[in-house]
């Protein structure tokens, strides 16, 4: 591909990637280069070995200070608990004895320079992750974490660092082949108006950080497109995180059109499709009650559709005490909104590892194995029930027996704590195929149902959620997943039990008409997605939604689903 002419570089030009985080942003493009650090292998004289070890310790200390400062900054801001938990994980990795003992031992034994030894050790860790976990979502995140930490420590060893995205004083759209979580965490959202990376996914740590900061993010471009992007460094850019579009040198009319669409919908527009169409609610997901203030200001009346209680442990670096849980849950109970708020029981396992507790189980089976922890949480819920009503969601159920056990334990705690049993409304999270086929029995024990689409798709297809998947799965759901969602929604509708949907699919505006057509009553999404979903809802009507839903149920391939959703 030849170089782009000067005239072409000044014309409006659009490149399309994959949407990761929704939103619109305008700014000057800033291309972050790959690390130019070249690690050379050096053999040291014996008298320099201890000095080299001290130099390594200093680099580790400086790296820990960097991360601790970022974590402290994140902990002090509303809605940033997930960012803090990711940075806490980086701190735990960098404190690992392997990174001190193994590296120091090798420097002493082989008399090699710290950069070379550290890089080799981190490379071996990455190889072992790839060998054990293949290309799972967990492995991809861990490898990205390893890259991030390696670059930070080696940067200190070589006295070279990337410029901080927190120091910008102009509006920028940041382009990077591999955008790291700590780079995103350090970005000042006042000036950093968008992220664009060669590769990325909606479930990556970088995406989680970007979403928490409400910074639009687009990723996954061909090598040819990325090469062309590099030629536009320094040009004005408009990023559309809903469509995955990057517009270079946007005309004034293009910019005005985008922002007219964005401002056309008031944040408080009623979410009623039409008079004859049942209400479909948009509720907010949170990871801490300190987000309630911003939800109330930006989206008045919005219900909390999912409080992810396990993030209390990630933020604290330990399991929360019962008293701490009571304080959080009471605030959730008392939060004024249009419906009853939803608390999900601790959902540990796989990529969400509970601090200091190793277990092969996940979700409700993890809780039943760790009965003391479960009873502590149920005790806190029982105490909070004195203040009002609360919906409680049991994660990852296999069948009705697990629901019965949890409810029995709760009744015991309610009696001990003088709680009000009637104030707690029990629901079940359907995210495992076995639960889909046991839905009749599960509905008998549940007052509401939440479909967790991320895990449901992953376990149904036997795959990772990450970019290694074949075909179009990362853009559209497989027909089998669509049919499972419909099956659950239809069975629940027969019993007049409300169904909500959470996960990436809930925030996908292309799937909105399908959910409405299936009779889903609520979509639980991260706060930044609410505005764009409201905009999409204004353009829908019930007849078209029902028609599309029926067509999607007849689809046999990814391609047919993709065609129907993009008609």
From Swiss-Prot:
GO terms for molecular function: kinase activity; metal ion binding; phosphoenolpyruvate-protein phosphotransferase activity. GO terms for cellular component: cytoplasm. The active site is at residues 205, 502. Its EC number is 2.7.3.9. The keyword Kinase applies. Mg(2+) binds at residues 431, 455. One of its GO terms (biological process) is phosphoenolpyruvate-dependent sugar phosphotransferase system. Phosphoenolpyruvate binds at residues 308, 344, 454-455, 465. Transmembrane segments: none annotated. Its cofactor is Mg(2+). Keywords: Cytoplasm, Kinase, Magnesium, Metal-binding, Phosphotransferase system, Sugar transport, Transferase, Transport. Coiled coil: none annotated. It is found in: Cytoplasm. It catalyses: L-histidyl-[protein] + phosphoenolpyruvate = N(pros)-phospho-L-histidyl-[protein] + pyruvate. Its main location: cytoplasm. The keyword Lipid metabolism does not apply. It is an enzyme of class 2 (transferase). Homodimer. The N-terminal domain contains the HPr binding site, the central domain the pyrophosphate/phosphate carrier histidine, and the C-terminal domain the pyruvate binding site. Belongs to the PEP-utilizing enzyme family. The reaction takes place in three steps, mediated by a phosphocarrier histidine residue located on the surface of the central domain. The two first partial reactions are catalyzed at an active site located on the N-terminal domain, and the third partial reaction is catalyzed at an active site located on the C-terminal domain. For catalytic turnover, the central domain swivels from the concave surface of the N-terminal domain to that of the C-terminal domain. PANTHER family: PHOSPHOENOLPYRUVATE-PROTEIN PHOSPHOTRANSFERASE. General (non sugar-specific) component of the phosphoenolpyruvate-dependent sugar phosphotransferase system (sugar PTS). This major carbohydrate active-transport system catalyzes the phosphorylation of incoming sugar substrates concomitantly with their translocation across the cell membrane. Enzyme I transfers the phosphoryl group from phosphoenolpyruvate (PEP) to the phosphoryl carrier protein (HPr). This is Phosphoenolpyruvate-protein phosphotransferase. It comes from Chlamydia muridarum (strain MoPn / Nigg). The lineage of its organism: Bacteria, Pseudomonadati, Chlamydiota, Chlamydiia, Chlamydiales. The gene is ptsI.
